[in-house]
């Protein structure tokens, strides 16, 4: 929650509830506004401790054949592209498509489409529908198949990734040390992009 932006939004006619989404907020929204045809969420789920409660609440807020489109960080891209700097202390989790599809199915969603984009180093965008037993599309099956191929030797990739991070750190240390030895003045400034 962010009090000032919520106040500004409400003053400008954008109905904003300045609370974390939970069952109480879900009940309040449903009582005040009813159910929805479409709900969207973009790169906020990594900050949520209880994803099950949020996804169930979202499911319950949708009309019988409503849609939910959400975006989450894609851990495959984080590893593949060495984007260790996209990992922040506020992020509680990172995702792969296959376990998300299984998780969504248990709640009652059918996944219609999965795509990747370059947002935040690589994100998954998933479109699902509040309707059980919709046949999984060729596109979703192909995405899951390709992800599965990438996951072969996953533990080796994680270990390689750790070595790559340490290599980057050591290269930076050597560079700074060399500049100091050359008589250069070295200054550092750190500012996380999302904290």
Question: Where on the chain are the PLM-derived regions?
Answer:
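A short glycine-rich, Lys/Arg-flanked "PGG" loop and its adjoining helix->strand segment in the class I
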Residues: 52-69
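A conserved beta-strand element that flanks and buttresses the S-adenosyl-L-methionine
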Residues: 37-40
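Glycine-rich adenosine-cofactor-binding loop
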Residues: 179-195
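Flexible, glycine-/basic-rich loop-and-beta segments that form/coincide
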Residues: 120-166
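Class I SAM-dependent methyltransferase SAM/SAH-binding core
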Residues: 1-27, 195
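Short, glycine-/aromatic-enriched active-site segment of Class I SAM-dependent methyltransferases
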Residues: 68-93, 97-100, 104
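Conserved S-adenosyl-L-methionine
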Residues: 109-120
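Hydrophobic adenine-recognition pocket in adenosine-nucleotide-binding enzymes
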Residues: 44
